[in-house]
Amino acid sequence: MIEIFAHRAIFNGIENSAKSIPYYKKLGIGIELDLRYNNNQVYISHDPTNNGDFFEEVCKQYDKSSIKLALHIKENEALNPTIKILEKYSIKNYFLFNTENFEYSNLVDKTKIADYVVKQDQNIKAKILWCDELQNKWYSEKIVKNLHKRKKLIYVMSLEVLEKCDEKSVYLEWERLINLGVDGICTKYPEKLIKFVKGDLN
């Protein structure tokens, strides 16, 4: 069964909100969150602002849940405090990625690091891959099979996360990604993707 991640834990039209956690715990799918650091606090926000919910509030509500957390570290300063919060609440089902290629500290379990992959010939070291085709279309059945032979987990960004598109284009993209055999999809429409995977979407 393909894994599903809610992009920025979107809930009732609001992104990166701690209020989404009970909903996605009940739904049983993963969430992707953007993490930043300011005033000695890790907070969730795509943009640099002090108005985001604290990441610790997310972890308090997580409470022994099994849903997977995809944590986008937006600033290097957020890294070590994030690890300490995860350890404080004994959260194990997560991975970290960043798009700036900064180095991870020794506090980070190397098995929890995902490589951010944007092209076919990129040097890949991690077991977990967080991928997109923003620059060009590079996914293929051959590439996915080869990565799986190397024991890689392939998580990809859905089309509507990367660009404006209509619903039909999103559904066609989901079909392509599923047929390619990727392990998970991050989407703005997690409920619809659940139905799509089950064949229940009219």
Give the ranges of each region predicted by the language model.
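Phosphate-group recognition and catalysis centered on beta-loop-alpha active-site segments
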Residues: 1-202
